Amino acid sequence: ATIYLADSARKSIVVGVNAGHGISGGASVKTQCHPDGSPKTTGGSTAQGATYATAVSGGMTFNDGTAESTVTLQMAQILKDKLLAQGYDVLMVRTGDDVQLDNVARTVLCNNVADCHISLHWDGDGLGYDKGCFYISVPDGLKSMEPVASHWQEHDALGASLVEGLRTEGMTIYQNGSMNIDLTQTSYSTI
């Protein structure tokens, strides 16, 4: 991970940018889904009811053979440059093809260094078209579990704000712009 400081008009806000995936061997390692050991409340890349999840999955592959991790890193680098230009400092969780930080470690790193954590991903459901942007909202089953209970409203507000910005820029938005998924990263986040 690397922190970049804005050259001018610094806002004293650090944005954690996590280019999803990009860990050699991450799919063969498991981490607890929730800090309290409780089972997942929804499905996703890990089934509902599971107590352990893949540390970092390999992600999807685009129709042209490009790995999701390659595209998320390119997106993260563009986002980093735009944030720095606006005066935000940026914690880049991953700056290359491989970083040996699982989803829990990435979240804990952002918890300790950043003011917010944005994890970039693509949804690989085999569609031959762009179904649109969305953020992962916090499912009701997690809203009473700490540290989620103390932060879920901020998580959802940030996600909604990001999607609204994308909508304003003319991007395609998936359904209402959010999808309830029990993510390991959400359950460990304190920012």
Model-derived features with residue positions:
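Catalytic-site microenvironment of enzymes
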Residues: 1-191
